[in-house]
């Protein structure tokens, strides 16, 4: 690996397990990584050159830390909520930042995102008017079920599916508790195909790197649907380019996106796409791991280079991207856990020598406890397997193989795994 940045210091905001691969790549590039977050036990800190407990929301504390360490660059990890801090810290230090205040305003708050999308003909999920006062005239207009969620949190945090008014009012309280801005939205609960659209931006050029179909669990009634797996490329690619792409690119240009990566999560129904969640940073889904294996370039290296130089490198993103994955079929396979303490994990060891598995990003280990308030969020993910096969049928067989093999037992002897992805739906 190129080590042209040997000895440079990079401050990375956020320490969750999904940020660990970013830290590891920077380490491999010879960079001195400094990870900071509010929890001393965060996973990514174990891989860092240095670690601090300055919370990612403490902008003044982050600026002070960056100055004391004389860092050469700052980069946000896999956390939507830290993108505003990233922008402010870089601005105060005069360091490269792929986000701007306008971009942060649009992509860090779901209500502002939806408002912006509609101006460009990019649809958001149908929404009901409701504020913290929960006025009777507004409540009477709501048709259930609905999804209640904070405008400024992700990964399922603070989200509730409500089937009646009592559950709605409880969901409002939960969403407000999880919102730093104390704002929430109430949307129609969509029961249709779920998709992710992942973009790469370089010097103002927008490239669609991948589009995938998400398959979520319906086992946890009343909670946000957590992903069971994603399949690449999506069966809805043609409809995307026919019905949404041009409007989306026009919106990105007017917002002022020049560099970086962006995921738009959405639903597909009757030929139309309804966007519900943007993420202007590397994703927990980590499609960049599949892209590294298939496209041959690594978005992590690209963003690290930008943080240290203000340039993502000398290449044409349109020449190396391929939204159709060069004819391959790929997937991320998520294993979700029920509440309990992990006593035993088996079946994952075979992934180490399986050429179909390009990565295994494990979040939890023996001795860890899945708490009640983790249910319905990505914190209940045991691990994600990244699979690449030559055909869709081979991919389905690989998924079945690992779902039959992987076992997780709690300290009271119970099976902790939720039901997996039904490959008949692929």
Q: How would you label these PLM feature ranges?
A:
Residues 187, 258-270, 318, 417-422:
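A short glycine-rich, hydrophobically flanked beta-strand micro-motif that places a catalytic Asp/Glu
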Residues 130, 159-164, 200-202, 269:
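Short beta-strand-to-turn element immediately C-terminal to the catalytic PLP-Schiff-base lysine
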Residues 91-158:
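A conserved helix-loop-beta module that forms one wall/lid of the active-site cleft
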């Amino acid at each position: 690996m190129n080590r042209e940045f040997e000895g440079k210091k990079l401050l990375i905001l956020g320490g969750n397990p999904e940020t660990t691969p970013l830290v590891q790549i920077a380490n491999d590039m010879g960079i001195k990584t400094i990870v900071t977050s509010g929890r001393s036990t965060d996973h990514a800190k174990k891989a860092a050159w240095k670690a601090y407990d300055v919370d990612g929301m403490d902008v003044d504390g982050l600026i002070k830390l960056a100055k004391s360490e004389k860092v050469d660059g700052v980069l946000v990890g896999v956390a939507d909520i830290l993108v505003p801090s990233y922008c402010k810290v870089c601005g105060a230090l005069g360091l490269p930042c792929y986000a701007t205040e306008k971009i942060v305003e649009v992509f860090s708050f779901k209500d502002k995102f939806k408002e912006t999308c509609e101006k460009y003909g990019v649809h958001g999920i149908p929404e009901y008017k409701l504020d913290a006062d929960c006025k009777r005239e507004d409540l009477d207009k709501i048709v259930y079920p609905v999804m209640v969620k904070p405008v400024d949190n992700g990964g399922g945090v603070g989200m509730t599916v409500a089937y009646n008014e009592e559950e709605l009012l409880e969901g409002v309280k939960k969403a407000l508790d999880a919102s730093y801005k104390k704002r929430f939205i109430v949307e129609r609960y969509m029961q249709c195909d779920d998709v992710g659209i992942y973009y790469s931006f370089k010097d103002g050029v927008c490239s669609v790197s991948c589009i995938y179909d998400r398959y979520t669990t319906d086992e946890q009634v009343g909670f946000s649907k957590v992903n069971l797996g994603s399949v690449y490329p999506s069966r809805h690619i043609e409809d995307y380019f026919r019905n949404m792409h041009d409007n989306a690119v026009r919106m990105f240009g007017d917002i002022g996106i020049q560099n970086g990566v962006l995921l738009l999560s959405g639903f597909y129904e009757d030929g139309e796409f309804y966007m519900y969640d943007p993420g202007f940073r590397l994703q927990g889904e980590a499609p960049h791991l599949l892209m590294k294996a298939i496209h041959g370039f690594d978005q992590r290296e690209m963003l690290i280079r930008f943080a240290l130089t203000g340039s993502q490198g000398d290449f044409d993103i349109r020449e190396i991207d391929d939204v159709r994955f060069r004819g391959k079929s790929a997937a991320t396979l998520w294993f979700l856990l029920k509440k309990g303490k992990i006593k035993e994990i088996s079946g994952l060891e075979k992934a180490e020598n399986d050429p179909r598995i390009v990565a295994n990003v494990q979040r939890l280990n023996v001795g860890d406890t899945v708490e009640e308030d983790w249910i319905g969020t990505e914190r209940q993910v045991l691990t994600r397997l990244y699979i690449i096969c030559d055909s869709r049928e081979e991919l389905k067989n690989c998924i079945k193989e690992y779902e039959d093999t992987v076992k997780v037992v709690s300290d009271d002897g119970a099976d902790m795994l939720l039901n997996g992805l039904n490959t008949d739906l692929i």
